A protein has these predicted regions:
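Bacterial N-terminal signal peptides
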Residues: 12-20
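Structured catalytic-domain cores with a bias toward divalent-metal coordination
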Residues: 2-8, 26-552
């Protein structure tokens, strides 16, 4: 993580030299914008008595905030606010800076100090998708409010971290994916891009108690084609919904935190719903789906890291700059609400996340875990707006709910996993995720379960939107059976214990049957195509070996 001391202009110039060469205007094409009917537009008036001072709202500006404008805005904030420090956590694939804004009452930015200052930390990540600018603009707006002291004394009770633009290349080109075609919000387990690795580093270093991931959803497009309607909600919200989440954490998200967000929207005259989408490729399929259950989205990855975690989506994709004030205001209200909720009882929040981390680490070798699951089907009432008249259209839709996950594969929770010595790529990714991995110094006979490969086939990943991204849609579908055995000659093997707070993240990475796993994505070596059967270089440890002397 490169420290960027904004108070020293020469160092700032050096740190942002590559970014400063980018053009002043983002490549937004107004000709591709969907124009709403007057009846639809009437549902989304400009918020009253709200001042919008971020770069996209400059008089006469027709596009969105450029990289250069964002950096200049941040620089001016940092120069005027002792509470704000800024670090550049990475350079994008095309060389643009990814800044992290760190707000503390005392003006410190050290992860070690923040971990000891007795306050919970809220992380806001915006614009993982480059063509979803409202989240990034609201992040700047909320940062400005914090910098100017307009959020009261919240910094006496919480720390706030903001990544206002996680995908600066996508923002510059006004495209959803990263420069290499990867969907950043499906890359938080595999870490195939510098952008996802940067976010992982922030998560590892600062251990946020609360994480908010800010996006925008498609307004027209497939909604018009399928329903002759457009989306009518201001904001769609969903907490983490993935396999093996801590029950107390899940209950807190589904209860008080969900309620706080919804009440904040209603208090400002904004319409909200649980998040849902529909397949953009199979237009004959009118099923509506909540956000997925995979561990690769930031919302779910943060949950597996024992953080209160929410996805926020506001209307925006495809409508250009229409209703931009209202879209940004909706995002701002959510960001403010999350910080206020954290500040309302900071000690209780810290106790919750501390207890969850301890509970997860203490679960090694106990009970069952869900290896593979799927959302359950049902019905759900939603309201869209007639695309021509704007009249509300309320109906009961076929629904795929991530709030109830149906188990497809369950297994006993092991004490940990062993990886063969040559599986360095998997070890490196686990460590980049913040996982503790140890190398065995001595050979011992270790009771294990071996993964025998029953079948291998190439397939396409499932995504509730129809595709993962421009790339990253393919995977190897693996089925295995477990064979109890004893592994000998283990000196040099890698041991990944589940007696650590990231245990459920480890399970998501190493159990082979899901589309996000290291096995399905080729990080862990598969048997060659010529082998009719084989085993994986990965074993489940069935007894506690952490207490064996001189093993590590």
């Amino acid at each position: 993580m490169v420290h960027l001391p904004f108070r020293y202009p020469r160092l700032l110039l050096a740190g942002l030299l590559v970014s400063a060469l980018s053009p002043a205007s983002a490549k937004f094409d107004a000709a591709e914008v969907y124009t709403e009917s007057p009846g639809v537009a009437a549902h989304f008036p400009v918020p009253e008595a709200v001042s919008f001072t971020t770069p996209a709202f400059a008089e006469g500006k027709k596009d969105f905030t450029s990289q250069r404008e964002m950096e200049s805005f941040i620089r001016e904030m940092a120069a005027s606010s002792p509470a704000l420090k800024v670090r550049v956590v990475a350079q994008s694939q095309e060389g643009r800076a990814i800044p992290l804004l760190i707000f503390t009452r005392e003006g410190y930015d050290s992860p070690q100090w923040i971990a000891k200052n007795g306050k919970p930390t809220v992380l806001i990540v915006a614009q993982q998708h480059g063509n979803e600018p409202a989240g990034g603009e609201a992040a700047l707006m909320f940062a400005k409010s914090l910098a100017d002291g307009k959020e009261g004394d919240v910094l006496s009770r919480v720390n706030v971290l903001i990544i206002p633009r996680a995908n600066p290349d996508g923002a510059e080109h006004f495209t959803r994916d990263l420069a290499n075609g990867v969907n950043l919000n499906r890359d938080h387990l595999l870490l195939a891009s510098p952008e996802s690795r940067a976010i992982a580093q922030v998560l590892n270093s600062y251990l946020p108690d609360v994480t908010l991931d800010a996006h925008e959803f498609s307004v027209a497009g497939r909604w018009v084609k399928k329903f002759d309607a457009v989306q009518g909600y201001d904001g769609l919200v969903q907490h983490a919904t993935t396999l093996n989440l801590s029950r107390p954490l899940y209950q807190a998200m589904a209860g008080a935190w969900n309620t706080a967000l919804s009440q904040a929207f209603k208090a400002h005259g904004l319409r909200d719903s649980v998040y849902y989408t529909t397949d953009q490729i199979r237009l004959e399929d009118k099923t509506l789906s909540m956000g997925g259950t995979g561990p690769d989205a930031l919302r779910n990855m943060a949950g597996l890291r024992n953080s209160i975690a929410f996805l926020l989506e506001t209307r925006g994709v495809g409508i250009g700059k229409a209703h931009f004030e209202r879209r940004v205001w909706t995002q701002f209200v959510a960001m403010q609400s999350m910080v206020k909720q954290a500040a309302a009882d900071p000690q209780a929040l810290m106790a919750l996340t501390r207890d969850v981390r301890s509970e997860v680490a203490a679960s090694a070798g106990k009970g069952e875990l869900m290896v593979k699951g799927k959302a359950t089907r049902g019905k759900h009432e939603v309201t869209l707006l007639n695309a021509r008249t704007g009249a509300p259209m309320t109906f009961e839709a076929d629904w795929r709910s991530s709030l109830q996950i149906a188990a497809e594969i369950t297994r006993s929770r092991p004490w940990g996993y062993l990886l063969a010595p040559e599986q360095q790529a998997a070890v490196d990714k686990l460590r980049a995720l913040g996982v503790e991995v140890y190398r065995l110094k001595q050979s011992r006979a270790i009771p294990v379960e071996r993964y025998e490969v029953a079948s291998l086939e190439q397939g396409q990943k499932f995504d509730v939107t129809g595709k993962v991204g421009a790339t990253g849609n393919k995977m190897t579908k693996v089925t295995t059976t477990l064979v109890k055995t004893e592994l000998t000659g283990t000196a040099g093997y890698w041991y990944v214990p589940l007696s650590q707070p990231l245990a459920n993240l480890i399970v998501a990475a190493l159990e082979p049957e899901t589309q996000s796993s290291f096995v399905a994505n080729g990080v862990i070596t598969l048997p060659s195509a010529s082998e009719k059967a084989g085993s994986l270089p990965l074993w489940r440890v069935t007894e506690n070996i952490s207490t064996l002397p001189d093993l590590f």
